[in-house]
Amino acid sequence: MPLPLLRKGQIMKTETTTVKSKALFSDDRTHRLLLRKEWDKNKKAAMIIMINPNTADTLNMDLTTMLVINNLNELGFGAVNIVNLYSRIMNKLSLRFNSNEDLLHPETDTVIEQYAAMSDAVIIAWGSAGNTSQRVRDRKAELLEHLAQYSNKLYKIGAHGYHPLTPIIRSGWELEPYEMEVKRNAESNKS
């Protein structure tokens, strides 16, 4: 593509960036287990865990994916591994008509654990979604058990653990350590 004409003495700098994309789908493309975007292989990689995948893939981006990439780039990251509590692709998570077997691919947690090991930071970004559903709370607890070995690199967005679409943090994130809740048995509560 030809460069625009410049007046004598003007200097113009061209910047080019390539974003590598990789996605891991089920054979029937009803589940997305991973969406990876890499724009600078020399920088840190983050993994972000949200609720469920939407329409983003290796070429198309939805608003959430765009906000994730923009904010992680500003924080100095060069790649993101996007995973979800539930791997079923849908516009909005529906627990009413779907069982956990429908919402989770059998390899979901394996993929999450593999990419948590390879990531420099693991960001819990499911926000308050599902706080009123025991099923979702159980799923969150189950996944956090798998991630306990990575507690030293678990973070949340802001003090409240926001989802990337939350208006107050869309244009700027502060990552804070994610505190793992420690389960106490009945014996330790007696004192």
Spell out what each predicted region is:
Residues 45, 78-79, 121, 153:
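Residues at the starts of beta-strands that form the adenosine-phosphate
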Residues 78-94:
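Short connector loops at secondary-structure junctions
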Residues 58, 92, 133-135:
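Short glycine-/acidic-enriched loop or helix-start segments at secondary-structure transitions
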Residues 34-40, 63-80, 111-114:
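Short amphipathic alpha-helices and their capping/turn segments at secondary-structure boundaries
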Residues 96-191:
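Glycine/proline-rich loop-helix segments at beta-alpha junctions forming the active-site rim
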Residues 2-62, 190-191:
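Active-site and ligand/interface coordination hotspots across diverse enzymes
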Residues 55, 89, 130:
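Feature marks short, surface-exposed loop/turn motifs that line or immediately flank catalytic pockets
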